[in-house]
Design a protein with these regions (language model features):
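C-terminal helical subdomain
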Residues: 178, 186, 190-229
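Conserved glycine-rich cofactor-binding loop
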Residues: 12-16
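Conserved mid-core segment of classical short-chain dehydrogenase/reductases
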Residues: 89-104, 147-150
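The beta1-alpha1 cofactor-binding region of Rossmann-like NAD(H)/NADP(H)-dependent oxidoreductases
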Residues: 56-68, 100
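Conserved glycine-rich Rossmann-like NAD(P)H-binding loop of the short-chain dehydrogenase/reductase
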Residues: 28-44
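Residue(s) in the substrate-gating loop at a strand-loop-helix junction
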Residues: 138
């Protein structure tokens, strides 16, 4: 994948993995647009990197996804890469009652938004040079963590969708890339919950190197192990991981 001279939209780009990728694309010579729900986080990102273009957008809402698409192709007609990175993770006890709206929001952000945005942008991307859709899934796509059941299920769904999307677009110029993180030391799910994870810069540097080499499925650490495991190995990983984090 050519890393310079692109125009890239990254959802959830004001923090975590999205922000780390945005920094690296910018340093490589690409134009970067980041969007997110929180205006304060976007301001902080722009203070650090004034070259960033920012847009407040809650991708959980269908109308805001459409508005994002219309704004992006109007303001940045050369946009050629969409990175579906935005995600939330919640611990959920399925035996307890909860507000269904919270589950619905997690599904919308983690699965519906990347599917919808991919379909919105596809006709535009097909007319650009070096177009790509990059979906950020998870090692939990392959082995669910039982205390984050909705997150795990949405990432499994997004992995499946990414495979189908890549197949359907195989005769078009649009490249479909999947980034599969392990636990990374970000604030996903809450501040301090992933301090045991891989350092963010270590993961982002690895991803960027693999993008440069042209890889289309980029997994790291425990996520790489899970993505290549046999069914018997997956069962063992599931048992061990869920005993550790119960």
């Amino acid at each position: 994948m050519e890393l310079s001279s692109n125009t890239i939209l990254i959802t959830g780009g004001a923090s975590g993995i999205g922000y780390a990728l945005a920094e690296r694309f910018l340093a490589a010579g690409s134009e970067v647009i980041i969007c997110g729900r929180r205006a304060d986080k976007l301001r902080e990102a722009k203070e650090q990197h004034p070259q960033f273009h920012t847009r407040v957008c809650n991708v959980a809402k269908e109308n805001e996804r459409i508005e994002l698409f219309e704004w992006a192709i109007s303001e940045f007609p050369n946009l050629n890469i969409l990175v579906n990175n935005a995600g939330i993770q919640r611990r959920v006890n399925l035996t307890e009652n909860e507000n269904w709206a919270e589950t619905e929001k997690e599904i919308e952000i983690n699965f519906c938004a990347p599917v919808h945005l991919s379909r919105l942008f596809m006709p535009h991307l097909a007319q650009r040079e070096k177009p790509a859709i990059i979906n950020v899934t998870s090692g939990l796509s392959f082995v669910p963590l039982a205390n984050v059941p909705v997150y795990s299920a949405t990432k499994a769904a997004l992995h499946s969708f990414t495979l189908s999307l890549r197949y359907q677009l195989s005769e078009t110029p649009i490249e479909v890339i999947e980034i599969i993180p392990p636990a990374v030391d970000t604030d996903l799910g809450g501040v301090g919950l992933h301090t045991f994870g891989v350092p963010l810069d270590e993961f982002a540097d690895y991803v960027f190197a693999r993008l440069q080499q042209g890889e289309i499925e980029i997994a790291y650490g425990t996520a790489l192990k899970s993505s290549q495991a046999s069914r018997a190995e997956l069962d063992e990983i599931f048992k061990s991981m869920n005993q550790q984090f119960r």
